[in-house]
Design a protein with these regions (language model features):
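Amphipathic alpha-helical interaction surfaces in cytosolic regulatory modules
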Residues: 12-38, 42-90
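Short beta-strand/loop segment at the start of cytosolic alpha/beta domains
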Residues: 1-8
Length: 93
């Protein structure tokens, strides 16, 4: 089974920048992963900072190990977002 996490819950937010704003999403991801599901993170219409992605994905890698990345998929990422995700994954793996 697969869970989809959409970052665009609040239309007033275009850029997710603070680490604290990633925690509720990471908690939701952790809950899905612990249930044996894979997770698709949908970045549609949103920009993110490295701090946000590190708290969202980097913290998961530190906690669960590098294999957690194989259970995550990313959708609707701009080139900038893709670059940030790649940097964080390589930094934490």
């Amino acid at each position: 089974m697969q869970t989809q996490i959409r970052l665009s819950r609040d239309s007033s937010i275009r850029t997710y920048g603070m680490r604290a704003s990633a925690i509720p999403y990471r908690t939701e991801i952790e809950r899905s992963l612990s249930s044996g599901e894979s997770v698709v993170i949908d970045f549609a219409g949103n920009d993110v900072t490295q701090s946000f992605v590190d708290e969202l994905i980097g913290a998961l890698i530190l906690k669960e190990g590098r294999q957690v990345v194989s259970r995550l998929a990313f959708e609707n990422c701009t080139n900038d977002v893709k670059g940030i995700i790649k940097f964080v994954v390589h930094d934490r793996v």
